[in-house]
Amino acid sequence: MPSGCRCLHLVCLLCILGAPGQPVRADDCSSHCDLAHGCCAPDGSCRCDPGWEGLHCERCVRMPGCQHGTCHQPWQCICHSGWAGKFCDKDEHICTTQSPCQNGGQCMYDGGGEYHCVCLPGFHGRDCERKAGPCEQAGSPCRNGGQCQDDQGFALNFTCRCLVGFVGARCEVNVDDCLMRPCANGATCLDGINRFSCLCPEGFAGRFCTINLDDCASRPCQRGARCRDRVHDFDCLCPSGYGGKTCELVLPVPDPPTTVDTPLGPTSAVVVPATGPAPHSAGAGLLRISVKEVVRRQEAGLGEPSLVALVVFGALTAALVLATVLLTLRAWRRGVCPPGPCCYPAPHYAPACQDQECQVSMLPAGLPLPRDLPPEPGKTTAL
């Protein structure tokens, strides 16, 4: 035992500490403090053990919640007369003093503070407080967990108090939570009970499918190409010389164009209109272009559409010129002048046409008609 400390009781864990050289004054509180349930503090007051209370630690602490009881040891609940139960809250004379049964029900005491009521016909409940009303008669008509209410059975009709997510007279209708179309980007809405879920298409995520997944997050583009995100897809902006979905292909370098004069065998002619003045002959107005020249023009940079257009235009022009020549020859053989300048028989009345201006003159009256000039049918010559 250290100097200046003296234990007052075997149960007490506290000591009275005195200053060195000063006597310990234990008689200040020991005369009135219940040392069996506490000890003296340095200031002379009683310090109670756990489970005891009071100025002198003379009273035990009852069980928490004990209403009509006492204790002999800490944490007890000893009921007073007329009370029962764990917390002494049950009235043993409840059937005689309180009459809890309603609507003419008879109270029967069961002991230990418990009772039950014998209800009259048409009533039920612990205290016969409920009447056999519409809810009782309908046999729990509310569905999906709804609560039937009929004002304790005294209402004419019942009503159903529905849980969240259901509506209807008997809570039979599940509210369509997809009615407002909460899912975006073409997602499928799945209705539940007071909830919904979105089945997102590929490329989208989130509760409402509003998050576009970054397809460039995995860095699919090669060769240092820049990735551009799309909906469930991506594009790679490849540098020069590379191609493919992810720029994985090395594009070949095209060879410089070369011109080779290859013999093509027999030369074919393409007829196109000439640009200069044409002489008056059957072959006038024609320009011959060989296939070799066309090939050289194509190698010089003339595209296939332009070449096709050139050939078609040349063929049409050749056909038109040929038709004109044939018609001219046919008319010349018949002695009929083609449409154009006014023509009359040339001197000596030869069957030829002249391209000069017409000069109309009257024949002398005594000059006979030439025999080799046949008269035209349907025309009359005035002399």
UniProtKB/Swiss-Prot annotation:
Disulfide-bond pairs as recorded: C29-C40, C33-C46, C48-C57, C66-C71, C79-C88, C95-C107, C101-C117, C119-C128, C135-C148, C142-C160, C162-C171, C178-C189, C183-C198, C200-C209, C216-C227, C221-C236, C238-C247
Side of membrane Cytoplasmic, spans: 328-383
Start and end residues of each EGF-like domain: 27-58, 62-89, 91-129, 131-172, 174-210, 212-248
One Pfam entry name: EGF
CDD domains hit by this protein: EGF_CA (cd00054)
Residues in the signal sequence: 1-26
GO CC, one annotated term: membrane
Keywords: Calcium, Disulfide bond, EGF-like domain, Glycoprotein, Membrane, Repeat, Signal, Transmembrane, Transmembrane helix
Protein name: Protein delta homolog 2
Organism in which the protein naturally occurs: Homo sapiens
Highest classification ranks of the organism: Eukaryota, Metazoa, Chordata, Craniata, Vertebrata
